[in-house]
C-alpha cells in the first residue's frame, strides 16, 4: 500500500489522475486486526463493568402484579369477594365441615410495625414569637359567662 506524506498530498492536484495500486489483501488484514483489537477492548470493558448498574435504572417503578379477588355467589344470590391466596385454598380443601373451617386460622398473622418519625422535620429550633401567637388569637370570641350574667339580670 502506498503511503503519502502531508507535503506530497498538498503538492498533488485533483485534476491529475493517479495510478491506482491498491493492495486488497493488506487492507483486509489491517481491518481484521482493528476488529480483533476492538473485540478485545470490549471484552475487557465488559469484564470490569458488565455488572455495574446504570444510574438511570432507579427512575422506573417496579411492576407489581395484583391478583384479582374471586367472586363467590351464594345460593341466595349474594356475591362476595374472597382474595385468592395459596394458604387459603389449602385450608379450605383440607377442612370438609364448616365448623372445622371456622376454627382454622385463615390468612397470615398481622405484624406490628413501629414507625419512627423524622423529628428533624417536625420540631423547630427557633422559639415562637409572642407577636405570632397574638396574631393567631381570635379577636372576637364568645364569652359564655358574660351571656349567662346577662340572662340573670333580665
Swiss-Prot record:
Biased composition (Polar residues): 118-128
One GO CC term on file: cytoplasm
Subcellular location(s) per record: Cytoplasm
Compositionally biased residues, Low complexity: 93-108
UniProt key word Protein biosynthesis: yes
Region named Disordered: 45-137
Domain of life of the native organism: Eukaryota
Keywords, sorted A to Z: Cytoplasm, Initiation factor, Phosphoprotein, Protein biosynthesis, Protein synthesis inhibitor, Translation regulation
Basic residues bias locations: 48-70
Keyword Cell membrane: no
Gene Ontology molecular functions: eukaryotic initiation factor 4E binding; translation initiation factor activity
A GO BP entry: negative regulation of translation
Pfam families: CAF20 (PF17052)
Record's function text: Acts as an inhibitor of cap-dependent translation. Competes with eIF4G1 and EAP1 for binding to eIF4E and interferes with the formation of the eIF4F complex, inhibiting translation and stabilizing mRNA.
Family that this chain belongs to: Belongs to the CAF20 family.
Name assigned to this protein: Cap-associated protein CAF20
Amino acid at each position: 500500500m502506498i503511503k503519502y506524506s502531508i507535503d506530497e498530498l498538498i503538492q498533488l492536484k485533483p485534476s491529475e489522475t493517479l495510478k491506482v495500486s491498491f493492495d486488497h489483501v493488506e487492507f483486509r488484514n489491517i481491518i481484521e486486526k482493528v476488529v480483533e483489537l476492538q473485540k478485545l477492548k470490549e471484552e475487557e470493558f465488559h469484564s470490569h463493568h458488565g455488572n455495574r448498574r446504570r444510574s438511570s435504572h432507579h427512575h422506573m417503578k417496579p411492576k407489581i402484579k395484583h391478583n384479582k379477588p374471586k367472586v363467590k355467589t351464594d345460593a341466595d344470590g349474594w356475591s362476595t369477594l374472597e382474595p385468592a391466596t395459596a394458604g387459603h385454598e389449602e385450608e379450605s380443601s383440607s377442612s370438609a365441615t364448616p365448623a372445622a373451617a371456622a376454627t382454622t386460622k385463615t390468612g397470615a398473622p398481622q405484624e406490628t410495625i413501629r414507625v419512627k418519625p423524622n423529628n428533624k422535620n417536625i420540631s423547630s429550633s427557633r422559639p415562637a414569637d409572642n407577636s405570632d401567637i397574638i396574631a393567631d388569637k381570635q379577636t372576637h370570641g364568645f364569652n359564655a359567662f358574660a351571656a349567662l350574667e346577662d340572662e340573670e339580670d333580665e
